Design a protein with these regions (language model features):
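N-terminal strand-loop element at the rim of the active site
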Residues: 6-13, 26-72, 158, 168-176
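A conserved mid-protein helix/loop that constitutes part of the nucleotide-sugar donor-binding site
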Residues: 14-22, 206-229, 246-252, 294
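Membrane-proximal helix-turn-helix segments that form the acceptor-binding/catalytic region
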Residues: 82-92, 134-154
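Short His-centered aromatic/hydrophobic patch
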Residues: 96-104, 120
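A short, active-site helix/loop in glycosyltransferases that binds the activated sugar's phosphate group
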Residues: 106-108, 148-175
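Acidic anion/phosphate-binding donor-loop and adjacent secondary structure
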Residues: 129, 163, 172-204
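Nucleotide-activated donor-binding/catalytic signature segment of Leloir-type glycosyltransferases, i.e.
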Residues: 252-268
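Aromatic "clamp/platform" in nucleotide-sugar-dependent glycosyltransferases that forms part
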Residues: 269, 288
């Protein structure tokens, strides 16, 4: 049985993390699978089959790390990536897959086999910005991606974005492939049946929901502004946001300033967002950019009407709207 290792920052709540758990659980009987993470105690770890092994660089979750450690660990990975690879990965697996952009790619690039794969989930042209630091990082990352035998993208737009930045990577066309995210439809439908209280999603008024990390990319601030304008125009509705992140305090302040506390709800993290999505009338994703937007596919499975901005996530609604 072939041995495969997938590398990812953590198995905390997130789109790529969700996809990885679904993939390895699906493949568990065909391959000997290990997941290598930088951080432990991710919420999705408990959803892994007991056949899947986990190697953790650190046992603690990212959230439990001190501010200093959060800054030091990525630097350590950059400096010590080769020694980390030798200790945990080298010679132990037939196929090595860096499943997410960032620190993991800096470790797995040292693989010697011809089965070294990297997965790209984000819009590379937009995720880093346009300042000097971003341009330097893109230059470094070009050398890293050049080391891989195969580069997998989650959408065609995702691939096109990558090619605009890294068109001069040797043999790039031969390395590239688009593989859309695998989603366990039955799992989503089953989890959507869980009971939630009426106080969470009020069915007496039109409801819009989104599931996203509270980061600038997801543009929740834009959603708040649109919500306020609609309320002022007499279009009454509630908006619910499932997720957490560094922009939470700023968003809370914006909600308070616009006096929409009663109609715009930040609900925090939910390990099972599906019953909330199922209960809402619409699903919205107003991101500035996306690699694909897997959550749109999940909302479609639950028969939600979709509100979306013009990003790579629009591929998910072709033929649907």
């Amino acid at each position: 049985m072939k041995k495969i290792v997938f590398g990812i920052t953590s198995l905390g709540i997130g789109g790529a993390e969700r996809v990885l758990v679904d993939i390895v659980n699906k493949l568990q009987d065909e391959y000997d699978i290990t997941i290598f993470t930088l951080y432990g105690k991710g919420a999705f770890e408990k959803e892994l089959s007991n056949k899947i092994k986990i190697i953790r660089l650190y046992d603690n979750s990212y959230e439990a790390m001190s501010k200093i450690k959060k800054k030091i660990i990525p630097i350590k990975v950059l400096i010590s990536g080769k020694s980390i690879y030798k200790k945990y990965i080298q010679g132990k697996f037939d196929v090595e897959i860096a499943f997410l952009e960032g620190p993991i790619t800096r470790i797995f690039k040292y693989g010697k086999s011809n089965k070294k794969i990297v997965w790209v989930h984000n819009d590379i042209a937009k995720v880093f910005g346009d300042n000097f630091k971003a341009k330097l990082k893109l230059k470094v990352d070009k050398k890293i991606y050049s080391k891989y035998d195969k580069i997998i993208f989650v959408s065609k737009d995702n691939e096109n974005s990558f090619n605009r930045i890294y068109s001069d990577i040797p043999n790039l066309g031969q390395k590239e492939e688009v593989i859309y995210n695998y989603i366990d439809k039955d799992r989503i439908i089953e989890k959507s049946k869980a009971e939630i209280g009426q106080e969470y999603i009020d069915k007496n008024i039109t409801s819009i929901i989104t599931v996203a990390r509270l980061v600038e990319q997801k543009a929740i601030d834009r959603l708040i502004n649109v919500h306020k304008r609609l309320i002022d125009d007499g279009i009454m509705h509630n908006i619910y946001v499932i997720g957490d992140g560094p922009e939470k305090e700023n968003l809370q302040n914006q909600i308070k300033e616009l006096k929409v506390e009663d109609t715009f709800k930040l609900m925090g993290k939910r390990e099972n967002p599906y019953p909330y999505i199922k209960r809402a009338d619409y699903f919205a994703l107003l991101s500035k950019f996306e690699g694909y937007g897997m959550v749109i596919d999940e909302a479609k499975i639950l028969n939600k009407k979709i509100i979306i901005t013009d990003t790579a996530a629009k591929e998910a609604v072709k033929g649907y709207l």
